[in-house]
């Protein structure tokens, strides 16, 4: 699937994360499907009611990038970011072409986001507007809930520590 539609694969990984958290955590999938599918949040703390506070909201994101966090909105709340890599040769782990190598959990306020604009316009294509976390490496420092110890970031990509 990744090689056919790279642009939607991160959404797919984020959806799998949402489903996993719904089944094993204090968070449940947002039952308001129009919000969950297009806006915010993906998950809400069980029992938090129809209008949860930002502290009860959890958005599931996935990225192949080691630091960037992007969203279509700059909502305040909790974010879980599944950092994954594609290993076509399956040399890191046999039979595993997709590896989640780090999971970041961070509370972000609206002010933590910066507007990144859009190339979309009447003349043709382009992305819809997005927001990115300002200074993501600094904001995510120490926020890894899970991190593989056999990988490191080199030249902006996760690689095996013994990689030359």
Task: Give the residues covered by each predicted segment.
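Nucleic-acid endonuclease domains
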Residues: 1-40, 44-56, 62-164
